[in-house]
Structures are given as C-alpha cells and as structure tokens.
Amino acid sequence: MMQDPISDMLTRIRNAQAVRKKEVVMPRSKLKMSIANVLKEEGYIVDYREEGDLTKAQLVITLKYHEGESVISEIRRVSSPALQVYKSKDELPKVKNGLGIAIISTSKGVMSDRQARRLGEGGEVLCYVS
C-alpha cells in the first residue's frame, strides 16, 4: 500500500520530465485530479485526462516543454502524512518571489496560493511548483 500518493505523483512527474517523456501515467484519485487541474490552470502542464474503468482508473498527465526544457523546474512536496503543514491566509508562502506557486488544500477545494489569497483562504500546503 502506498504511504503518500501525492509524493508518488510528484516523483512520477519529476522522473518523466528527466527523461523527456510526453505523458506520465499514475493511479487516479480525486486529490490528484485536483492537483493536475491546478497545474493545468497555472500553465505547468498541457492537459490531463482519466483512462480506464472505475476499478483501474488511471490519471494521464501530458507534460509541457518550452524549447526542449521542462516548464516545471522544481516540484517539491511540503506537507506529508507525518508532518502536515498548515498556513493561514496571511502566512501563505510566495514561491520564488511569486514566480512559482504553492498548491493549497482548503475547505473550498485545492487551489494555487494566489487563488487562496484572493479568496481569503488558508489551508494545508501540499507542494511548491516553479
């Protein structure tokens, strides 16, 4: 059984980009779909989709490259099952002075730090992307 599916997702993306893969496939969950949606909205991936039936559902993420280089230079897990990191709306981090994003899980769903600030929401900091 997988201990931390979010870390697994981020590692799969990082490894796929290291070998310049076009797509990366992983087991699907609602949280992973929400994270993929934020990555797409912020322009870090081209697209994502679901494949398979309900028992073997897969999430397929199409990675984005610019002039042969990955658009994501760093993707790092912040909160983990052993140490969850929560920030209030006033404490939300700015990643790389606003050039990157933090993905936050709030009571209103998973969103970027910019959107959480706009809505006045705090929550669990899942990961940093730049």
Swiss-Prot record:
Keywords: Ribonucleoprotein, Ribosomal protein, RNA-binding, rRNA-binding
Superkingdom of origin: Bacteria
Cited Gene3D superfamilies: 3.30.1370.30, 3.30.1490.10
Cellular component annotations (GO), alphabetically ordered: ribonucleoprotein complex; ribosome
GO MF, one annotated term: structural constituent of ribosome
InterPro entries named among the record's database cross-references: Ribosomal_uS8 (IPR000630), Ribosomal_uS8_CS (IPR047863), Ribosomal_uS8_sf (IPR035987)
Pfam families referenced in this protein's UniProt entry, alphabetically: Ribosomal_S8 (PF00410)
Role this protein plays: One of the primary rRNA binding proteins, it binds directly to 16S rRNA central domain where it helps coordinate assembly of the platform of the 30S subunit.
Sequence similarity: Belongs to the universal ribosomal protein uS8 family.
Assembly information from the UniProt record: Part of the 30S ribosomal subunit. Contacts proteins S5 and S12.
Protein name per Swiss-Prot or TrEMBL: Small ribosomal subunit protein uS8
Lineage: Bacteria, Pseudomonadati, Pseudomonadota, Gammaproteobacteria, Legionellales
